[in-house]
């Protein structure tokens, strides 16, 4: 979505996730490259290149750190519970619709052929394992266990399943570690014109990222009955540091992720 190499996006998730977890305000919250943030900066990346994208991410991180220093995150508690439920349910609908496209052909019709039946079957098996694994052991995250079992079956039995390479292209991950950018400031002119170009995108990205992150903190607070409340101030600063670090590495930034945080908490993370 943001116009970066998939490996860069993955590394961006690793760097952002590590820094946000280290400096954030709530254990259990998972952060990474976010579709919501990527949509905001996609136009900037397309028109000015990835250098301006990285500069935008760094500036967004600075704005998030400033929001944390001013303790602006506390206002997220004014969001009523029904709004938070609508946010989570809406996200579930969006995620489901995004996944359903992989079960359709080019004309938008469901795949009702051999390939489709294999995909439906593997999906059903994965969902069943996610429910069954916790009944057998609690030491293995059910989602990870299901992926490992189903992936192993596909490999061992040579099941002709659709893979990421077959959808995105065989050369999607070509380049390996050499594709990952080095730690350096983005190569953009340090001028008022550059600031005028990236500031509107950075401000929106910072706001969208903090809203999703702080709502995720509230959601995790409700799921974990440990008597603790996440610190909105620390979460703002943690997200900001994560985005600054991600931008310096040439990443696309991101925020806390509701779906991944739910999976993490339910898996005992």
Show the residue positions of the predicted features.
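Transmembrane helical cores of multi-pass ion-transport proteins
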Residues: 1-269
């Amino acid at each position: 979505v943001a116009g970066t190499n998939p490996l860069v996006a993955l590394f961006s998730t690793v760097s952002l996730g590590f820094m946000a977890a280290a400096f954030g305000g709530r254990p259990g919250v998972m952060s990474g490259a976010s579709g919501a943030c990527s949509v905001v900066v996609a136009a900037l990346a397309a028109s000015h290149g990835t250098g301006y994208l990285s500069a935008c991410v760094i500036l967004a991180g600075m704005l998030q750190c400033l929001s944390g220093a001013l303790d602006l995150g506390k206002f997220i508690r004014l969001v009523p519970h029904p709004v938070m439920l609508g946010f989570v349910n809406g996200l579930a609908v969006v995620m489901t619709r995004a996944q359903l496209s992989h079960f359709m052909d080019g004309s938008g019709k469901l795949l009702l052929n051999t390939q489709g039946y294999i995909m439906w079957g593997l999906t059903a098996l994965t969902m069943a394992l996610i429910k069954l694994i916790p009944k057998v052991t609690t030491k293995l995250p059910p989602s990870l266990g299901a992926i490992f079992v189903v992936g192993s079956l596909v490999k061992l039995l040579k099941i002709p399943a659709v893979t990421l390479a077959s959808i995105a292209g065989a050369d999607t991950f070509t380049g390996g570690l050499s594709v990952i950018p080095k730690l350096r400031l983005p190569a953009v002119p340090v001028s008022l014109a550059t600031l005028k170009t990236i500031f509107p995108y950075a401000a929106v990205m910072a706001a969208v990222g903090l809203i999703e992150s702080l709502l995720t903190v509230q959601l995790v607070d409700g799921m974990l009955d440990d008597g603790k409340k996440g610190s909105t101030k620390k979460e703002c600063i943690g997200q900001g540091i994560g985005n600054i670090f991600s931008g310096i590495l040439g990443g696309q930034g991101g925020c806390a992720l509701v779906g991944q945080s739910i999976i993490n908490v339910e898996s005992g993370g």
